[in-house]
């Protein structure tokens, strides 16, 4: 056991959480990931705000290791394994991958790791923030314009930027903001929710818009948001 005998106080301005020492914890795993997360444990009184992304995650080895490190920290802060497993998936770990098979392996590995701490995790509607990067189809159909309104330019921008996403992967550099993506997502979901109130042709077109844009919006959000830790092992670069 390591005693942190120097009293400290950290505040997260966003969450308004405070913590003061001394505290006691097990010696963390001896790796760069461990040291980084334990440092953020002191910077962020609420570990839920510490976010890591592997932008070239492959089959998820780094994310799975980071999961165990984060579990140590959550336990140190008094969380149960069941709650910590869900919070790690939903709040802390993000990943992108261009290969579909590797993405499925990463998703499976993370869910199995989470299940080792929470046996009910598979029966819950848990949000997992790992995605396969998808390419766009190229151009918008003219008939989509009536549904997109003021969002047409943003949609066309995303489609243009992701035309070669399978080649470029996470190095795609987007100039849009999270706020713009949030507004677009709300608009698309609103269209989907009200699709039953329109004729069959319109329903089909709205479904096509939803299926085309939602994956692009999700991966765009991961590319534009900020992270505390970015770590990867891109062997092909």
Place the predicted regions along the sequence by residue:
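SAM-dependent methyltransferase catalytic region
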Residues: 1-237
